[in-house]
Amino acid sequence: MNAESRIHALRAELDQHNYRYYVLDEPSVPDAEYDRLFNELKALEAEHPQLVTADSPTQRVGGAALAAFSQVRHEVPMLSLGNAFEEDDLRDFDRRVVEGLDLPGGDLFAAQAAVDYSCEPKLDGLAVSLLYRDGQLVQGATRGDGTTGEDISTNVRTVRNIPLKLQGEGWPAVLEVRGEVYMSKAGFDRLNAAQAEAGGKTFANPRNAAAGSLRQLDSKITASRPLEFCCYGVGQVSEPFGDSHIGILEKLKTWGLPISRELRHAAGIEECLAYYRDIGARRNDLPYEIDGVVFKVNSLASQRELGFRAREPRWAIAHKFPAMEELTEVLDVEFQVGRTGAVTPVARLKPVKVAGVMVSNATLHNMDEIARLGLRIGDTVIIRRAGDVIPQVMQVVLDRRPENARPVEVPTECPVCGSQVERTQLVKRSKGKETISEGAVYRCVGRLSCAAQLKQAIIHYVSRRAMDIDGLGEKSVEQLVDEGLIRSPADLYKLEFEQVVVLEGFAEVSSRKLLEAIEASKRPSLARFIYALGIPDVGEETAKVLARSLGSLARVQVALPQVLTYLPDIGLEVAHEIHNFFEDTHNREVIAQLLASGMQLQEEGELGAEFAASTTLAGMLAKLDIPSVGPTGAEKLVDKLGTLDKIIAADGIDLRQALNTKQAEGVREFFRDEANQLLARAIEAQLLDFGMHWSCEKRSAEGLPLAGQTWVLTGTLERMSRDVAKEQLERLGAKVAGSVSGKTHCVVAGPGAGSKLAKANELGVKVLDEEQFVAFMAEQGITL
């Protein structure tokens, strides 16, 4: 056998030993024999360097250090999971799944359907993506923000149980595998012992050790660390395989990818809870750290039907374990001032180690929480790291209270600016007029004249997901505020080179770059600008909803709270926060100053198609909380009377032609109140002013462009929801079905389309992708 043949044989044999050791947990040779084969291959490759390939087992040792990681955009976003902390949270998740799939159990008297779930431990490590092309590992990336991560390809190649090339056959030409890189408890102990012996820094816990090791610019350091990988799913694939989550993982295992040995199937939520309790009981005996378990709807078809909400799937949830707890002493309670002026208490603690991290501060949320706990300064308390991250005071140990323990007092003046601190009653708004007390918050009234509020407002405004002004970190913002150079976000656009260059940390080049970044920020998308304003309770996703649905800042500024509730995922409380923010004179002045600085908002335009299509006069009436009148009654009312004016003016005889006696009386009673009439007219007037229009005439399906045609929607549509696409197709006369048959006229297939697309191709049914569908609808006069 010549050298080339021997090298090929050794690689194949070592790959098989790796597969049996890391994936099957069935070592086939002693370690000494493996080492002998490995060293023989290493020696042969040294003699014949032209035969060295990237997928050789010897190429896991790491290469030259990088200056920095480059960015990688995830073709399919790496989404986070929703959390469940109590059994009731998990039961609520199961109920939402059952309702979302329209299974039995949605009403009070039906037996709850048992959904099939997959169950696996939630490893406490770092989420990564592995991209294989034609079976070869070509890229590794971190999760990052879910959309963009860091290219860690060189480092993931050093992780021993990540195959550099896939085993077997039948894998897709493009296969993105997702999973967790972690460090076992034993590996962590060995690493810390070695670090201590060498006089180096030890790590607080395995997760920090794994994350720090994987993100080393010098891959040789990564190669020396005991990292492991476990896959939990896939991202982009060139062709789908499997019809269940467990089926996909089992297939990945045959291709050499390690999956959890604790992977199980559960028939219904009770079996999920039993799995959670079992893993919890064995948690300390597992060879790795976990912080919960993950449950996923096993059927891929059901996953697609359930879809996503914001940045998390509706078909999966992480059931977290209770955080680890410790006793310590409250040395003092100090007050911090946040971006919105809220004055919040923070407990200063006698330092104590919790879950591997030294804790000296803990959140107390607000004074109501202090009252609930009965907390005094000097008390001994139980603290825990909520979600294993944020230290939180859970309970006061009263029998350890010292005689000199003193109550916590709210400052009457802001600890930062000296302005008055006011108590504001919080309310939880129902759909009607009633409010429910939700405690109180203390706020500094200094607004942007308070340095603490101003600093936090500017830090938020310049952040990467807001205006993305590079070069302005917290310390730089503090300097600008402390020097009196900025008193509102608008002052950023008045900064001059001479003012910046003299600041600590700035030189000529960095000063010019900062000013260039500030100038470049004058063309933000509408969503970024809304998010940057720092409206209470308005995060990145809500800002996108506002921008996408209302289409312009002018509409967002004047939108009534009731109109805002028509938007996806915006409830009445958040709607009032948005409305109140734009009603505030000071906020309007700051926005006017920003626009006057040369701000040019991008992506402004008409009302969003989804919002326009989903908002009807009947829908508006249903949201008014007219006694006894729900969506169906509202539809009947509009079908019979047609306009809001006629509905308001209708007498009992007119109303009873559309509704039953109780409903008719509810409508009359509601509109007897002049305030309700004014509210309804104001909402309608605003919607009409925004460009909405009510159509009272119903066309029959006959004569419509798609009359008699059956269409099917599959996959994920990115420019609209499937509900909107369905509604618009039905407007054109089509019937939208849930399955493909020989009678199907056309299938609209978005990313992730599976069995329905395959069936359409098999039957020769016409298929449109999303862009083609949008173009087709435009030809019919409908803009999506």
Swiss-Prot record:
UniProt gene name: ligA
Pfam families: BRCT, DNA_ligase_aden, DNA_ligase_OB, DNA_ligase_ZBD, HHH_2, Nlig-Ia
Taxonomy, superkingdom: Bacteria
Residues the record lists as binding Zn(2+): 414, 417, 444, 450
Organism per entry: Pseudomonas entomophila (strain L48)
NCBIfam families referenced in this protein's UniProt entry, alphabetically: dnlj, PRK07956.1
Listed GO CC annotations: cytosol
Entry keyword annotation includes Metal-binding: yes
Entry EC no(s): 6.5.1.2
UniProt similarity note: Belongs to the NAD-dependent DNA ligase family. LigA subfamily.
Alphabetical GO biological process terms: DNA repair; DNA replication
UniProt cross-references to SMART domains, sorted A to Z: BRCT, HhH1, LIGANc
Catalytic reaction equation(s): NAD(+) + (deoxyribonucleotide)n-3'-hydroxyl + 5'-phospho-(deoxyribonucleotide)m = (deoxyribonucleotide)n+m + AMP + beta-nicotinamide D-nucleotide
InterPro entries registered for this protein in UniProt: BRCT_dom, BRCT_dom_sf, DisA/LigA_HHH, DNA_ligase, DNA_ligase_AS, DNA_ligase_CS, DNAligase_adenylation, DNAligase_N
Annotated positions binding NAD(+): 31-35, 80-81, 120, 143, 180, 296, 320
Residue ranges constituting the BRCT domain according to the UniProt record: 701-784
Annotated protein name in UniProt: DNA ligase
Cofactors: Mg(2+); Mn(2+)
UniProt-listed PANTHER family: CHROMOSOME TRANSMISSION FIDELITY FACTOR 18, DNA LIGASE
The keyword RNA-binding belongs to this UniProt entry's keyword annotation: no
Function: DNA ligase that catalyzes the formation of phosphodiester linkages between 5'-phosphoryl and 3'-hydroxyl groups in double-stranded DNA using NAD as a coenzyme and as the energy source for the reaction. It is essential for DNA replication and repair of damaged DNA.
Keywords, ordered alphabetically: DNA damage, DNA repair, DNA replication, Ligase, Magnesium, Manganese, Metal-binding, NAD, Zinc
Residues at the active site: 122 (n6-amp-lysine intermediate)
GO molecular function, one term: metal ion binding
